[in-house]
Amino acid sequence: MRHDCTDFRQLFLDDVPMMDMRAPVEFAKGAFPGVVNLPLMTDQERQKVGTCYKQQGQAAAITLGHQLVSGTLKRERLHAWASFAKAHPDGYLYCARGGLRSLIVQQWLRDEAGIAYPRIKGGYKALRTFLLDTTQQAVEQCDFVLVGGLTGTGKTDVLHQLNNVIDLEGHANHRGSSFGKRATAQPAQIDFENKLAIDVLKKRARGIEQFVLEDEGRIVGSCTVPLELYQGMQQYPLVWLEDSFENRVERILRDYVINLCAEFVALHGEELGRRLFAERLLQSMSNIHKRLGGERYQRLSEIMRLALDEQQRSGGIDLHRGWIEGLLKEYYDPMYAYQRDAKADRVEFAGDAVEVREYLKARNR
């Protein structure tokens, strides 16, 4: 018989299957990768029990809970829990704090399905605290270096060739710029933090103690970099990636036009996907309207519209280079040049993609 679990580190390192007893509304606010939500109560049932608890106390709330989850409902949920337990005999169950909900499910599984299934002591809150501490400890104990560079130099491409990268944009499902929103949604803030911490945990378990990050702002789309990490990023040494203007334009064309359009088409089909892609590009330009200024915004938006019309009509993408070149020369490059000057004393190396990659690999030896 397996015992209830307190070894949170091994749970995440081994990707142990877990079922979450919390209500859907709790699960949506934050969960762990791969965990299955099989709630004891629906959102409405949980709300009723919570109100009863406040007004009449714990005993009355427990009685109401048993009344709400009974008969056919109870049998259906018990079947789902038992199916998970049989499919994942090495797994665990948990609720918010390792309290009544997980105890009740554990008891019902044992008494009515004949399955002894362990739970996680302390529940979701204990697991979440462990992951927050994991990130904090890494910031305190590990070595970090940032990769910076003008827009389109291929920072993400370089990072993906390293085994000690913490991919903030990947975890946030966002490219980091005003145009960085993907076709699929970003994770909830807590999910972003949890994935980041698990990534750090697994890499440290492999002996990695030096991490490479892209030089990001505090906000990556709608996800916020943990404060302790972001504060460190204001001081970490910086490696500056360089590339030609022409290569940068082509890379942006690839990422923000060709690949983004393909993402939308894959999700929504040809016609709707192309329309949503066009709307996304125009909205991204609109998001920096004030920073561009009226005249520049109108000019670049018109070039973008013409490019989108041509792409829709013939599939041609050449006209997109016009607004990309304009944005780089008139907006992104001056902004990044200013930021680089402000961080000049932290730049320990500069070079092209091959040179930067080799430098970072050597630095990690």
From Swiss-Prot:
Gene Ontology MF terms: transferase activity, transferring alkyl or aryl (other than methyl) groups; tRNA 2-selenouridine synthase activity
Domain Rhodanese residues, every copy: 12-136
E.C. no: 2.9.1.3
Catalytic residues identified in the record: 95
InterPro entries listed in its UniProt record: Rhodanese-like_dom, Rhodanese-like_dom_sf, SelU
GO biological process, one term: tRNA wobble uridine modification
Highest rank taxon of the organism: Bacteria
Catalysed reaction, written as an equation: 5-methylaminomethyl-2-thiouridine(34) in tRNA + selenophosphate + (2E)-geranyl diphosphate + H2O + H(+) = 5-methylaminomethyl-2-selenouridine(34) in tRNA + (2E)-thiogeraniol + phosphate + diphosphate; 5-methylaminomethyl-2-thiouridine(34) in tRNA + (2E)-geranyl diphosphate = 5-methylaminomethyl-S-(2E)-geranyl-thiouridine(34) in tRNA + diphosphate; 5-methylaminomethyl-S-(2E)-geranyl-thiouridine(34) in tRNA + selenophosphate + H(+) = 5-methylaminomethyl-2-(Se-phospho)selenouridine(34) in tRNA + (2E)-thiogeraniol; 5-methylaminomethyl-2-(Se-phospho)selenouridine(34) in tRNA + H2O = 5-methylaminomethyl-2-selenouridine(34) in tRNA + phosphate
Keyword line: Selenium, Transferase
Disulfide cysteine pairs (residue numbers): none
Gene3D superfamilies hit by this protein: Rhodanese-like domain
UniProt function note: Involved in the post-transcriptional modification of the uridine at the wobble position (U34) of tRNA(Lys), tRNA(Glu) and tRNA(Gln). Catalyzes the conversion of 2-thiouridine (S2U-RNA) to 2-selenouridine (Se2U-RNA). Acts in a two-step process involving geranylation of 2-thiouridine (S2U) to S-geranyl-2-thiouridine (geS2U) and subsequent selenation of the latter derivative to 2-selenouridine (Se2U) in the tRNA chain.
Subunit structure: Monomer.
Family of the protein in this entry: Belongs to the SelU family.
Protein's recorded name: tRNA 2-selenouridine synthase
Organism: Pseudomonas putida (strain W619)
Gene, per the UniProt record: selU
